[in-house]
Every structure is written in structure tokens, then in C-alpha cells.
């Protein structure tokens, strides 16, 4: 399986977990409001709370942990959304930017072509000598850049498969070593997920930046 798909799947699972946690939190808040009302369910809840005080205890706990729950759910949505939606679009975003850059180069070539042709003129038919060489390099850039962009794209995909496979295999080992006998719990999961997300972003951008790097370095 392509490592990029594995990264996206982890983002999907994270977003589903965040949505489930948000749903549970909203349900708990709704039940708390029902208890405060005078509906049939609210009256029964008031009677049960008067006998056991469980309702007041749960309301106090929910009120105390609400900021932490909201923060954790928000972090999970951001990290999960980054892995699930943004990361798979990075190759297209970079490719689109490179294509627009090539169109700009074509526009520059259209403007510069008459000037380049003018440099070939001379009273003795020899033109302006070595000053015309820049035009040939520019023409080569216009013609060859799309092919080199495709080469860079495939090189980036191959590099991502190698680097992503290595990351997915080694990250779990590094995590197990770092968390040996640790009991930090849910907050550590969020921080490690943030570390993994940042490493994935760096990897994918570094690999598919070859779409831009290969033409610039070759031409």
C-alpha cells in the first residue's frame, strides 16, 4: 500500500475519532440541559439526582473537563484533516504551481522572441555573437521543462514510497522506545500525532518539490 494512502487513512481514523468524541460531548451537554428542564425526562432526572446526587457530580466533572475536551477534539480535527485532506493534495498543488510557472515562462518567451531575433541581425551577417546564446537556452527551457517536470514527478513518487515506508516502519519503533514505561496517556498521543504529521508534511513536500527542482537544476 502506498505510504501516502496509509497517512491519509490515519487522518481519516483521527477525524472519525474526533467526530465521535464531539458527538459524545454534545450528547452529554444535551442530557445535562434536559436534567435542568421540566420535561418528563427532566423531572425523572431531578428525582434521581435528588436521591443519588449523581447528576450534580457528572455535571461538575463535565464542566471541569470541557476546555480540555474541546482542545483535544480541535487538535484531532486539525491533525486528522491535515493528513486526510491536505497531504494527498500536495502532489497536485505542487504540480499545478509548476504548470503555472511554465505558462509564465511561455509568456516571457512570446515577449522575448522578437528581441532574440533582433540579436541575430548585424551589418556583416554575424549577428551579436555569443549574446544570442541566452535565447537558445531560454528556448530549451520552454521545450524541455514539461518533460523534466514529469520526470521529477515520478522521481518524487518513488522517493515518497521509499521514504514513507521507512517512516511508517521506524516511527512505531521510535515511539515504543520513547514511551517505554510511560503513563502520560491521551496527551502524549496528540503530541506524537503532531510529530508524525509534521514529518509526513516535510517528507511529501521534499519529495514532490523535485517537480520544481529537476528542471531548475538540469536546464
Please give the residue ranges for each predicted region.
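Juxtamembrane interface at the cytosolic side of transmembrane helices
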Residues: 89-103, 107-108
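Generic structural signal for bulky hydrophobic/aromatic residues embedded
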Residues: 103-107, 146, 206
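Residue-level signal for the membrane-embedded core of alpha-helical transmembrane segments
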Residues: 108, 147, 151-154, 194, ...
